[in-house]
């Protein structure tokens, strides 16, 4: 009698439409309950039984129940699952398989089976790639996954690398393929093999892609010739090797080893500018005025060179600083180093005055043993030799940006527009509270941005700089010429690393078309999208491997009195994050470690400060001493506490 009753259907419909609902993201906790976060202000409690239907990170719609002043959420439908493809550790019990996702807030094992075509016999502790197949909110009885790829065994010393590369779906080895002979590009190459070109790199570098040669003129100017390795002399556009490089977009540099964009015989041999070997190059010659200005007579041309010395950063820096026992092999090489130092000083002064110079941060290098164990982590400060190469490359990239813009009107450009226009009013208000006055429209211009950056760089600490970072936009890769606010330049297009950046290979082909006087099509936007995505994934992979290695390195310091100097890099409601100065590891200090009485403690992300009883005790950029309280290997997180 009730089956087809229209009134009943209408009543059901009414009840359904009147029931309050909310859409948001599930946040799991370690206690079994969770929260539905609707926005920054509003969240609803999800009781433990209801959490069984969802997973941390799922975007869902939930019914909101109100009982005795308390609201709770009952998951109703799935908008977007958190897990689709993931990595994890296999559990095996009575021949039944399950997988625990490798994620700090996902602790539950998900029943699974090997997908069709996966031959591996999975054992307890194996690492695998899995894909979700069932979800309770899709009408399934429970969660279920399929194992689509075996990564490695639990006792493999190189787990951090293989698991991270699998997680981000990145290649594990160099691409296949060989380039047997140079292409006939119809380019006339100048013979510069007699000139004293030198390369300056880390001692262990094999893929040398830049060589430098400087000379002085009678009227006090400097001529700099930058010669860059020429992989596009071997790799035809649209060839198998080219397409593989296009997908990879970059060489992936991970702690301990790299996965090259090109086959190793190209990156480390045929294209590498090895000492005393004749190599084809794409070259740029520029004239530097006394104040470091790059004059208008920029020239790009194809050439052959023979590097006369493979120099190492530390040797060159020591020699220029009058330390150590290393000496250049000849007077000619010594003269080159001295001239290149002059080039560096002129360009550095020009950039200080007319553009922007990044503050020097050390690079951290992991020293690894045979089995991937971390023997040491070394902070490598940026010294004079690093700056010689950096200034030469930036100058060469400015030249390419100008020539591509003026001759073609397009290229592969690194573009950074400074601040997001939507944020400049807030930015000006924040700066005003610190007695720095800016015009919200003026900071959107290159000149206004540079003026503000110089003012911030002159501040006694980096505190204010850290506060405004969230208002900045991200750098992008674009085929359209545009300014790079971060560098303080009108245009910037890189072409100096074609062995390890596909965008630089594209710019090589464009520059060669200009040299030959040919027309050439604008690069496809898909290429720049792929580059941006790969850059993001490679950075995440590098960070993930580093986190794992930091946890291994500091594990034996947990619970000891060993003190580390640490810079506060972020404050959140739950505590603060710090970076250890000596090795670059990031650690978290939970709020209870800062002060025992929660009501007397205010951790403000907005202000970047921690107040105790109304007094600012810690702020971002402060350097404090910490000890390591705990290292959680399964989540690769390091917990620290202020040293007393």
Swiss-Prot record:
Subcellular location: Cytoplasm
UniProt record similarity statement: Belongs to the RNR ribonuclease family. RNase II subfamily.
Pfam family, one: RNB
GO annotation, biological process: mRNA catabolic process
Species whose genome carries this gene: Klebsiella pneumoniae subsp. pneumoniae (strain ATCC 700721 / MGH 78578)
GO CC annotations on file: cytosol
InterPro entries named in the record: CSD, NA-bd_OB-fold, RNase_B_OB_dom, RNase_II, RNase_II/R, RNase_II/R_CS, RNase_II/RNase_R, RNR_Ribonuclease
Domain of life: Bacteria
GO MF term set: exoribonuclease II activity; RNA binding
Protein name from the UniProt record: Exoribonuclease 2
Entry-linked PROSITE patterns: RIBONUCLEASE_II
Occurrences of domain RNB (ranges): 189-516
Keywords: Cytoplasm, Exonuclease, Hydrolase, Nuclease, RNA-binding
EC number(s) from the headed UniProt entry: 3.1.13.1
Domain S1 motif: residue ranges: 561-643
Function: Involved in mRNA degradation. Hydrolyzes single-stranded polyribonucleotides processively in the 3' to 5' direction.
Catalytically driven reaction(s): Exonucleolytic cleavage in the 3'- to 5'-direction to yield nucleoside 5'-phosphates
Gene that specifies this protein: rnb
């Amino acid at each position: 009698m009730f089956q087809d009753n229209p009134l009943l259907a209408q009543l059901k419909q009414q009840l359904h439409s009147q029931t309050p609902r909310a859409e948001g993201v599930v946040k799991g906790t370690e206690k079994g309950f969770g929260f539905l976060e609707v926005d920054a202000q509003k969240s609803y409690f999800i009781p433990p039984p209801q959490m069984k239907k969802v997973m941390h990170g799922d975007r869902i719609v939930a019914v909101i129940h109100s009982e005795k002043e308390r609201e709770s959420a009952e998951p109703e439908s799935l908008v977007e699952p958190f897990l689709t493809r993931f990595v994890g550790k296999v559990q095996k019990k009575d021949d039944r398989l399950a997988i625990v996702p490798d994620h700090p807030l996902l602790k539950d094992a998900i029943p699974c089976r090997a997908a069709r075509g996966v031959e591996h016999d999975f054992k307890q502790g194996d690492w695998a790639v899995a894909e979700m197949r069932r979800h309770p909110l899709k009408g399934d009885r429970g969660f279920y996954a399929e194992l689509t790829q075996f990564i490695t065994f639990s006792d493999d010393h190189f787990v951090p690398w293989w698991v991270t590369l699998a997680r981000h779906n990145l290649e594990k080895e160099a691409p296949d393929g060989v380039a047997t002979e140079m292409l006939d590009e119809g380019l006339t190459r100048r013979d510069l093999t007699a000139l004293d070109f030198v390369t300056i790199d880390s001692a262990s570098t094999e893929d040398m892609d830049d060589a430098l040669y400087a000379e002085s003129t009678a009227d006090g100017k400097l001529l700099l010739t930058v010669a860059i390795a020429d992989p596009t002399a071997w790799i035809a556009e649209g060839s198998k090797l080219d397409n593989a490089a296009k997908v990879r977009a970059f060489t992936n540099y991970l702690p301990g080893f790299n996965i090259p964009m090109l086959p190793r015989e190209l990156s480390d041999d045929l294209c590498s500018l090895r000492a005393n070997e004749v190599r084809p190059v794409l070259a740029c010659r520029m004239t530097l005025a006394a104040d470091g200005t790059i004059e208008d007579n920029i020239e790009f041309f194809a050439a052959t060179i023979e590097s006369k010395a493979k120099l190492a950063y530390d040797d060159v820096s020591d020699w220029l600083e009058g330390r150590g026992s290393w000496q250049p092999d000849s007077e000619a090489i010594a003269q080159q180093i001295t001239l290149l130092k002059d080039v560096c000083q002129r360009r550095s002064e020009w950039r200080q005055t007319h553009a922007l110079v990044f503050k020097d941060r050390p690079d951290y290098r992991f020293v690894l043993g045979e089995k991937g164990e971390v023997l040491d982590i070394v902070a490598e400060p940026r010294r004079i030799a690093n700056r010689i190469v950096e200034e030469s490359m930036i100058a060469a990239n400015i030249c390419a940006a100008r020539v591509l813009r003026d001759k073609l009107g397009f290229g592969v450009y690194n573009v950074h527009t400074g601040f997001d226009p939507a944020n400049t009013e807030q930015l000006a208000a924040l700066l005003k509270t610190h007695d720095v006055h800016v015009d919200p429209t003026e900071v959107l211009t290159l000149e206004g941005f540079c003026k503000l950056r110089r003012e911030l760089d002159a501040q006694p600490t980096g505190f204010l700089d850290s506060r405004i970072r969230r208002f900045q936009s991200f750098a992008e890769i674009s085929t359209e010429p545009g300014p790079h606010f971060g560098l303080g330049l009108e245009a910037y297009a890189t072409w100096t690393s074609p062995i390890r950046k596909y965008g630089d290979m594209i710019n090589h082909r464009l520059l060669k078309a200009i040299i030959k006087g040919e027309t050439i099509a604008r690069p496809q936007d898909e290429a720049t999208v792929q580059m941006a995505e790969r850059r993001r994934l490679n950075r995440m992979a590098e960070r993930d491997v580093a986190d794992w290695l930091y946890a291994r390195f500091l594990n034996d310091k947990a619970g000891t009195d060993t003190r580390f100097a640490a810079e506060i890099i972020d404050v959140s409601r739950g505590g603060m994050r710090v970076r250890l100065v000596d090795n670059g590891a990031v650690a978290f200090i939970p709020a209870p470690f800062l002060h025992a009485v929660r009501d007397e403690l205010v951790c403000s992300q907005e202000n970047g400060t921690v107040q105790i009883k109304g007094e600012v005790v810690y702020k971002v950029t402060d350097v404090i001493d910490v000890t390591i309280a705990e290292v959680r290997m399964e989540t690769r997180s390091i917990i620290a506490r202020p040293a007393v």
